[in-house]
């Protein structure tokens, strides 16, 4: 086993050039969401690759029901919601290990990039900071490099390195590259697990960073707010009702609610830390959050706008229910309406998903902790996040013990301009994944 481990690790180190080329291929396929186009194209690339390893490969498009639950019309989604599934069958088929990464990316900002966001450029240095795992392998740039296409590559080459050594497992390995994680994952991993397409005994969620072992994440609910005004000539605005002005009042109230109520609503998770960048700003427990993400309204400066709409993300802590969150959210807006008789509004839930907490004491988690130390030479802390990942579907719906980690840190600038991934981190990630494959599935 030790000899096999060294062969696998050497294979990954020796094939960095191929790893980079494959990630470049994925980065150059535009899968930003919204709208979420080209999922089927990227799934085909994954299918071609995994067919080389003797996997059973399939592409599943989510059904109409899941499209509606995703917020299809509200978010302006387009194209099939394609999901890739590969099965590397073992001798006995037990246990079953499922690993997942997502193929969609955050939207690409129109300005502020110093590199082509779909270019996959490679440099030796990172001006935003170096990865602690940087051994001189360089950085690859583009939207999705670290979130989450680098992880798609890591799980791919972890299997390739084992396949090239002729490895066959006792158990079955299921690998999924799924869509729409950035908007809730309803038509992605949610669809695959809730429809019974993916069932497993253990899970790995490749999403996050290499700063720790992720065991918890918060739930989230996405709201759409609309204000309704009365259009009029902009030179006589007193005769109209300005929908943007009304939305501005709502936003003042929402920000007060976030800072004075939600941020104080914190919950400690025993044995689980928050990422250092949150602790640095005074948040050492998971906290309820709120973000006003988009706002649209008006047609021109000379017309009083009669419509305005915005999307708001409400991050939930364990114990909060969707009904509680919705009722409290609406009560904030009702408080504004009580002071403004002209305020007319609508609130709609785009989609929602619950958070999750894995116990640090679970045997699987303790085994994984040892694998991280074996590969990286040091123990990593158990982390919780104020974000949300598709791991909730594995834990809550699939009933799989699971953990998450991935590629990147603050220097990787996920969701920001100039996103990148450390090539050495992708290799380290792949080593960890390969060892989990070996240890949990067993060598036949």
Task: Give the label of every model feature segment.
Residues 7, 11, 21-25, 29, ...:
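Generic non-transmembrane alpha-helical segments
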Residues 205, 209-212, 292-298, 385-402:
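Short glycine-rich, acidic/polar surface loops and turns
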Residues 11, 371, 375-443:
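Zn-dependent metallopeptidase/amidohydrolase metal-coordination segment
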Residues 251-259, 272-277, 354-402:
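Active-site-adjacent substrate-binding region
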Residues 68, 80-84, 94-173, 423:
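Active-site metal-coordination/substrate-binding segment of hydrolases
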Residues 2-110, 307-311, 325-328, 425-428:
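N-terminal helical capping/dimerization or prosegment-like subdomains
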Residues 200, 234-295, 302-304, 318-344:
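Acidic-enriched catalytic cores of C-N bond-cleaving enzymes acting on peptides and small amides
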Residues 139-216, 273, 279-283, 441-444:
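Acidic/histidine-rich catalytic neighborhood of metal-dependent amide-processing enzymes
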């Amino acid at each position: 086993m030790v000899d096999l481990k060294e062969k696998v690790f050497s294979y990954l180190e020796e094939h960095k050039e191929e790893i980079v080329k494959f990630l470049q291929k994925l980065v150059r396929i535009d899968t930003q969401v919204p709208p979420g186009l080209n999922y089927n194209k990227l799934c085909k690339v994954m299918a071609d690759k995994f067919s080389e390893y003797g996997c059973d490969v399939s592409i599943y498009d989510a059904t109409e029901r899941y499209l509606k639950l995703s917020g299809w019309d509200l978010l302006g989604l387009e194209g099939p919601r394609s999901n890739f599934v590969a099965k590397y069958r073992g001798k006995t088929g037990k246990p079953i290990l499922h690993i997942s990464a997502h193929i969609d990316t955050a939207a690409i900002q129109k300005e502020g990039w110093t590199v082509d966001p779909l270019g996959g450029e490679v440099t030796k240095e990172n001006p935003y900071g170096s990865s602690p795992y940087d051994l001189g392998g360089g950085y690859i740039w583009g939207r999705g490099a670290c979130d989450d296409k680098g992880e798609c590559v890591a799980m791919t080459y972890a299997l390739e390195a084992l396949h090239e050594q002729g490895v066959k497992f006792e158990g079955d390995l299921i690998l999924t590259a799924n869509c729409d994680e950035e908007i809730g994952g309803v038509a992605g991993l949610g669809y695959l697990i809730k429809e019974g397409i993916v069932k497993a005994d253990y899970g790995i969620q490749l999403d996050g960073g290499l700063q720790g072992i992720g065991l918890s994440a918060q739930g989230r609910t996405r709201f759409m707010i609309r204000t309704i005004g009365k259009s009029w000539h902009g030179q006589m605005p007193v005769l109209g009702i300005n929908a943007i002005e009304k939305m501005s009042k709502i936003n003042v109230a929402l920000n007060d609610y976030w800072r004075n109520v939600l941020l104080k609503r914190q919950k400690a998770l025993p044995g689980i830390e928050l990422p250092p960048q949150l602790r640095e700003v005074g948040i050492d427990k998971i906290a309820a959050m709120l973000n006003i993400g988009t706002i649209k309204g008006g047609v021109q400066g000379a017309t009083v706008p009669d419509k305005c709409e915005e999307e708001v993300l409400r991050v939930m802590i364990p114990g909060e229910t969707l009904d509680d969150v919705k009722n409290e959210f609406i009560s904030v807006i009702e408080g504004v309406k009580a002071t403004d008789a002209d305020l007319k509004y609508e609130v709609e839930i785009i989609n929602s998903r619950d958070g999750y907490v894995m116990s640090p004491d679970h045997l699987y988690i303790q085994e994984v902790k040892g694998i991280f130390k074996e590969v990286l030479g040091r123990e990593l802390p158990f982390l919780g996040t104020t974000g949300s990942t598709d791991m909730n579907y594995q834990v809550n719906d699939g009933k799989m013990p699971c953990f998450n980690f991935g590629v990147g840190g603050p220097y990787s600038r996920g969701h920001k301009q100039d996103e990148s991934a450390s090539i050495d981190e992708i290799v380290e990630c792949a080593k960890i994944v390969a060892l989990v494959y070996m240890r949990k599935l067993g060598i036949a």
